[in-house]
Amino acid sequence: MTVPAFTVVIPARLASTRLPDKPLADIGGRPMVVRVAERAHASSAQRTVVATDAPAVAQACAAHGIEAVLTRADHPSGTDRLAEVAAQLGLADDAIVVNVQGDEPLIEPALIDEVALHLAHHADCAIATAAHPLHDSAEVFNPNVVKVVCDAAGRALYFSRAPIPWARDAWSGVPAMPAASARVPLPDMPVLRHIGLYAYRAGFLRRFPTLAAAPLEQTEALEQLRAMWHGERIAVMQTAAAPAPGVDTQADLDRVRTLWAQSMAQEGP
């Protein structure tokens, strides 16, 4: 597998409502954003850059030899922030930029490579992303779990917080929002959970801030729907299993710290 040249950009903002100062949270003696950058460095990326509007994050990165750029604080979405970084770095239109979320300290470097390669193999698409099959009906009906349906070529048809596709026969009589404890049969067709990892062409990132916000984007609160609303194609790479957990809450952080310690113990001195 020949992985194309690509740059990783890691957005990192301090203004998290559920976990204040999240990028600076300690994981094994280093800030979380540094741990994410270390995972990106272990991929085939030619360059890894943290994008932040917080001098404290930039300083933490500098202290650990991680490149960081300061961006405006008023970006309406993470993709708008990436667009500013692509411009700052002077990337060519055909350059590939992989957006690794700043709260994914356990992300597999191979997954980063794979999404970059997937975009390189789909010249008709401006974006590539990933998804995996769901096996738990509670996740299927959870609006915090984003689902995606694809066409025969593996391009996204739609992303939604709703359970899609709706299994008319299997879910006959099932309420739209069943109790989390309810046992709901899964349809024969896999329900795909979207993984929030993206590869973009830099030329698209430059165009993105000029695109008008889309009604579907605003209704679902999913910024990738703006790209689709304006006719851009998104290639979806399917993985067999879910990625390692990210960090949204204190409970997530505690879990990731435990997993990190376990992985270090397995590696040994």
Curated annotation (Swiss-Prot):
Pfam families: CTP_transf_3 (PF02348). Keywords: Cytoplasm, Lipopolysaccharide biosynthesis, Nucleotidyltransferase, Transferase. GO terms for biological process: CMP-keto-3-deoxy-D-manno-octulosonic acid biosynthetic process; lipopolysaccharide biosynthetic process. Pathway: Nucleotide-sugar biosynthesis; CMP-3-deoxy-D-manno-octulosonate biosynthesis; CMP-3-deoxy-D-manno-octulosonate from 3-deoxy-D-manno-octulosonate and CTP: step 1/1; Bacterial outer membrane biogenesis; lipopolysaccharide biosynthesis. Gene3D superfamilies: Spore Coat Polysaccharide Biosynthesis Protein SpsA, Chain A. Its EC number is 2.7.7.38. GO terms for cellular component: cytosol. InterPro entries: Cytidylyl_trans, KdsB, Nucleotide-diphossugar_trans. GO terms for molecular function: 3-deoxy-manno-octulosonate cytidylyltransferase activity. It catalyses: 3-deoxy-alpha-D-manno-oct-2-ulosonate + CTP = CMP-3-deoxy-beta-D-manno-octulosonate + diphosphate. It is an enzyme of class 2 (transferase). It is found in: Cytoplasm. Activates KDO (a required 8-carbon sugar) for incorporation into bacterial lipopolysaccharide in Gram-negative bacteria. Belongs to the KdsB family. This is 3-deoxy-manno-octulosonate cytidylyltransferase. It comes from Cupriavidus taiwanensis (strain DSM 17343 / BCRC 17206 / CCUG 44338 / CIP 107171 / LMG 19424 / R1) (Ralstonia taiwanensis (strain LMG 19424)).
